[in-house]
Amino acid sequence: MENSGKANKKDTHDGPPKEVKLPTSEALLDYQCQIKENAVERFMFQIKTLREKNQKYHERNSRLKEEQIWHIRHLLKELSEEKAEGLPVVTREDVEEAMKEKWKFERDQEKNLRDMRMQISNAEKLFLEKLSEKEYWEEYKNVGSERHAKLITSLQNDINTVKENAEKMSEHYKITLEDARKKITKETLLQLDQKKEWATQNAVKLIDKGSYLEIWENDWLKKEVAIHRKEVEELENAIHELEAENLVLIDQLFNCRLVDLKIPRRLYLTQAAGLEVPPEEMPLELPETHIEEKSELQPIEVESRDLMSSSDESSTLHISHENSIEDLQYVKTDKEENSCTEFGDTDMKYLLYEDEKDFKDYVNLGPLGVKLMSVESKKMPIHFQEKEIPVKLYKDVRSPESRITYKMMKSFL
């Protein structure tokens, strides 16, 4: 007794056993076992319900049979009573037909029960199959789906790497192909140039004396033409500058004449009306400088015919190379003459730019009359300057300057 008490004390001291953690595989197996047990329990419950229904149906059938027997007895009793009362007698055949109908009804009921049982068994089988499929898909969802997802991601990564490698290889092949094409074209051009050089060298070796001189003369003419064109350009630029200066000077002359048409009162009284100026008044004072009057004036428009005449005068300067030199000298002389007359004496006749006889014409113009002026060009003789052209003998073929080079031949190709 004491030992049993000690053992009970030890059990009480130890307390409830501690739960041991199982590995994942055993935990999955336990989980599946629990699922199976739950399914079996559900099936057992369904079977139990079906058995109860079957028992109820059997009880109902037995009750119906008892009721049938009671009804038959009741009918027989009624028949016997009716028979006793003189009613028509029910024969054996009628009873057999009624019994046959009743048995037929019972057989139909039993057949229906068998069909119902077959349907229930088939439904149970389908239910078990669907339950197994459900368990399989649940297991796949918990375990297999993760593994398959990892496989899918790894395969997608492999496909992406393969695509990237293919793109890189295609780009590399394109670059190499372009480099190869460039090298081939470069080598072909170099070979063509070399062959052209060799062909020209061979042609130079086999040239006769007449064609040799013609080639050399052609090269010399090209150089002379280049020099001539350069000189022509320089002369054209100089002519354009001189034309611009000429137009500026003509504009200044027009402005000076229009200003001088404004005649003062003292000059009008003494020269046009023939009156004497009173001694009290001061004599006419001329402006100190002609340049200051020009700076105070406003520019006045010149008619189109004057500009056309000046353009005609300038158009005569565009001539050949030798004539342009003489025109340049002629324009320079005109410029010097204009500058001399512009800064000459400041006399009264110079201010009017006319003689005293023509002074009345200015007076008759009226206060608002303006004399329109024009410029006319005049052809002048051109003196040609003979240039001494150095005479070169083309027969001296042995000199180093008269040799035909590859560049000279290449210019003809």
UniProtKB/Swiss-Prot annotation:
Key words of the record: Coiled coil
UniProt feature coiled coil, ranges: 36-186, 216-255
Cytoplasm among keywords: no
Region span, Disordered: 1-22
Basic and acidic residues composition-biased segments: 8-21
InterPro entries named in the record: CCDC83
PANTHER family found in the cross-reference section: COILED-COIL DOMAIN-CONTAINING PROTEIN 83, HSD9
Protein name per UniProt: Coiled-coil domain-containing protein 83
Phylogenetic lineage: Eukaryota, Metazoa, Chordata, Craniata, Vertebrata
Gene (name only): CCDC83
